[in-house]
Amino acid sequence: MLLEVLNPRHYNVTSMVSEVVPIASIAILLLTGFLLLVWNYEDTSSIPGPSYFLGIGPLISHCRFLWMGIGSACNYYNKMYGEFMRVWVCGEETLIISKSSSMFHVMKHSHYISRFGSKLGLQFIGMHEKGIIFNNNPALWKAVRPFFTKALSGPGLVRMVTICADSITKHLDRLEEVCNDLGYVDVLTLMRRIMLDTSNILFLGIPLDESAIVVKIQGYFDAWQALLLKPDIFFKISWLCRKYEKSVKDLKDAMEILIEEKRHRISTAEKLEDCIDFATELIFAEKRGELTKENVNQCILEMLIAAPDTMSVSVFFMLFLIAKHPQVEEAMMREIQTVVGERDIRIDDMQKLKVVENFINESMRYQPVVDLVMRKALEDDVIDGYPVKKGTNIILNLGRMHRLEFFPKPNEFTLENFAKNVPYRYFQPFGFGPRACAGKYIAMVMMKVILVTLLRRFHVQTLQGRCVEKMQKKNDLSLHPDETSDRLEMIFIPRNSDKCLEC
């Protein structure tokens, strides 16, 4: 029996081979197909960028964005691979562009009106298919944009001049509220309060606690910035999300109380024309069934946080630049005296404040706050000879482009860079085209009003050795000073006194 078992003639060799060969063939074919797929993926891409390398490339590039921040990672990759290059974010092919011709193409075409970001992250903060800033549903975005456009132009823009000037005067009269024990002014907090107050009066009209809401806005922004590109697995770990959940809830709860008060005032108003504003228009649209309550609340929230979040930092950087460049301050003061004199600033002064406007433009070019734009291709396209597939993410690196093309002294702060008219394709601090910043005109007017009103009353100085170039910053969704660092305060000296303001 044993010999029979050991005898090869008792085995059906043909049967054994026929069973083994198909299994081996399938394994070899699968491996070959996978290798061909990887090889084909890398070889068919003509766009410069890091290697795919069996999926490790996308993992590394996404981790770099999470570690360095969006803005810093974009600068790193453009410097390494050129002004039109490809990485992966959230596993999706993403182009990083700092070339003006390519940016112009993306901004002007309607098939790039969508943005991109983690769906779970945007749901977490309430922006997924709601509001305007990161609403990636083109139909819903188009439904709310007219409300923003109407509120931020025409009569609203004219009203803003007086409202903003009054708010600045009111806050400067109470400057001790934002001074430390040495009399140094916390400019960021001051600007955030002024802009929140102005936005509230214009768009909501409900009394609020500025100090508390400003803190909540910063917490919300930190959550938004931190969660925008997080992988889905992050949101399945509850303890990782807890801090951000509280920050988002704090602002949303505070805003909901204010908006409910607005609803009550509308329902009990004897004359509706007395309370018609941005929030009222949205609430009426909700009653007509055009918008959901959640979308209305998110739109109002975004309208109130926009200026305290970004424009306040822009003016903060501007004041530091004024302190470092006294000749620029002198030129601005001469123009302010000539155009405005001793009276209140008016809307018809805006076009005459050319030096102030050039200063604002050069400040936004040299030290931007919003230095990138995130978009998604909604259809196949070709940009500067490179094929772009539908669904491709695109990041426009505006800050880098503003230092690469056209300007005679791109790495210096000088008004010479705007001595001549700059073609708008080379300077886009607010973007342009169908998804340009809805508030770009009112933002420019608001910054002029703030600078004129403040500089007429105070000369500004930084603490010794402080300037924007040496300031620690975080370059993520936007570029902000590191507020954990010291000596971000400034010294305000009244124009009619040689002594520093004592708060």
From Swiss-Prot:
Extract one GO molecular function annotation from the record.
Answer: heme binding
Q: Which reaction does it catalyse?
A: testosterone + 3 reduced [NADPH--hemoprotein reductase] + 3 O2 = 17beta-estradiol + formate + 3 oxidized [NADPH--hemoprotein reductase] + 4 H2O + 4 H(+); androst-4-ene-3,17-dione + 3 reduced [NADPH--hemoprotein reductase] + 3 O2 = estrone + formate + 3 oxidized [NADPH--hemoprotein reductase] + 4 H2O + 4 H(+); androst-4-ene-3,17-dione + reduced [NADPH--hemoprotein reductase] + O2 = 19-hydroxyandrost-4-ene-3,17-dione + oxidized [NADPH--hemoprotein reductase] + H2O + H(+); 19-hydroxyandrost-4-ene-3,17-dione + reduced [NADPH--hemoprotein reductase] + O2 = 19-oxo-androst-4-ene-3,17-dione + oxidized [NADPH--hemoprotein reductase] + 2 H2O + H(+)
User: Which pathway features in its UniProt record?
Assistant: Steroid hormone biosynthesis
The entry's heme-binding residues are 437
Where does this protein chiefly localize? endoplasmic reticulum
Q: Which UniProt keywords apply?
A: Endoplasmic reticulum, Heme, Iron, Lipid metabolism, Membrane, Metal-binding, Microsome, Monooxygenase, Oxidoreductase, Transmembrane, Transmembrane helix
Q: Which Pfam families match?
A: p450 (PF00067)
Binding positions (substrate):
309, 374
Cofactor(s) for this UniProt protein: heme
Q: Which Gene3D superfamilies match?
A: Cytochrome P450
Bilayer-crossing residues are: 19-39, 53-73, 303-323
Q: How does it sit in the membrane?
A: Multi-pass membrane protein
Q: What does this gene product do?
A: A cytochrome P450 monooxygenase that catalyzes the conversion of C19 androgens, androst-4-ene-3,17-dione (androstenedione) and testosterone to the C18 estrogens, estrone and estradiol, respectively. Catalyzes three successive oxidations of C19 androgens: two conventional oxidations at C19 yielding 19-hydroxy and 19-oxo/19-aldehyde derivatives, followed by a third oxidative aromatization step that involves C1-beta hydrogen abstraction combined with cleavage of the C10-C19 bond to yield a phenolic A ring and formic acid.
Query: Which family, according to UniProt?
Result: Belongs to the cytochrome P450 family.
Q: What is this protein called?
A: Aromatase
Give me the gene this protein comes from.
Answer: CYP19A1
